[in-house]
Regions:
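Membrane interface segments of multi-pass transport proteins and intramembrane proteases
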Residues: 25-32, 68-71, 104-110, 155-164
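Short helix-terminus and kink motifs of transmembrane alpha helices
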Residues: 18-23, 61, 97, 101, ...
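Peri-membrane helix termini and adjoining interfacial loops of integral membrane proteins
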Residues: 60-63, 103-117
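Transmembrane helix-loop-helix hairpins at the membrane interface
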Residues: 89-98, 109-231
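Short alpha-helical transmembrane interface motifs in multi-pass membrane proteins
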Residues: 32-36, 47-48, 81, 85, ...
Length: 231
């Protein structure tokens, strides 16, 4: 079990290192395109951290079974479960999203929510940066974040603190790792909670990877289209 605690620590260390690299590049006053490209490529390398248990000697089969990177009922069925679970959770998500946004506007007296870093990056005119962002959102995030937050963290906490605390706790860390503004943190946390429930339902992260990938694909594509039209 200690290998999975180490995995979480190694992942966050890698994630923090990428952030520090970004600050260092800003201090060095490199061009925005170079800054974004280097940081995004470095974030791709963080994907290697999910293999920490394997690097420490755990058999691949055992690692995959622990984190849920398998489909004992069949891959097609798990993909279908991911799509159905995502669609069902979106009904809850949209209701809560509307409530959160309404409360925000009341509290902040109609001030619009702060734009996120991802919005700024997606506004880049550099094709390489856009490709890196799109692949990070639609490939890296479903694989790495689901393996870490639902496959490792949720799984580790589930047997120790129960379903509710494990789902909420892993969703909270998932949201905070994104570093968004408060409103966006709540919405990302709600996604994380839904993914945790899908993980509990299926005993696999394949459906959560599908749900995560579909969500990020739709959102990122929509943002690219909107920013392209507004540009």
């Amino acid at each position: 079990q200690i290998l999975f605690v180490e995995t979480i620590a190694v992942f966050f260390a890698g994630f923090l290192s990428v952030r520090l690299l970004g600050f260092a590049l800003e201090a060095a006053k490199v061009s925005p395109d170079v800054h974004e490209t280097v940081v995004l490529v470095a974030q791709w390398l963080v994907a290697l951290t999910i293999l920490w248990p394997v690097a420490r000697g755990m058999p691949v089969r055992e690692w995959r079974r622990y984190v849920g990177l398998w489909a004992p009922r069949g891959l097609a069925r798990e993909i279908g479960a991911g799509l159905c679970g995502y669609a069902a959770w979106m009904l809850v998500y949209f209701v809560i999203a509307m409530l959160v946004v309404m409360v925000y506007y009341v509290v902040r007296q109609n001030q619009p929510p702060q734009s996120s870093r991802i919005t700024e990056v997606l506004g880049s005119n550099n094709p390489l940066v856009l490709v890196l962002v799109f692949t990070l959102a639609t490939m890296w995030a479903p694989l790495v974040e689901e393996t870490i937050f639902r496959g490792t963290l949720y799984r580790y906490w589930r047997v120790r603190v129960g379903l509710g605390a494990a789902a909420v706790g892993s969703a909270a860390l998932f949201a905070m790792a994104h570093g968004y503004a408060p409103v966006q943190l709540v919405l990302v946390g709600m996604l994380g909670l839904g993914f945790a429930l899908i993980r509990e339902w299926r005993g696999s992260i394949v459906p959560t990877m599908v749900a995560h990938g579909v969500h990020n694909f739709v959102v990122t594509t929509a943002m690219l289209v909107i920013l392209g039209l507004s540009g």
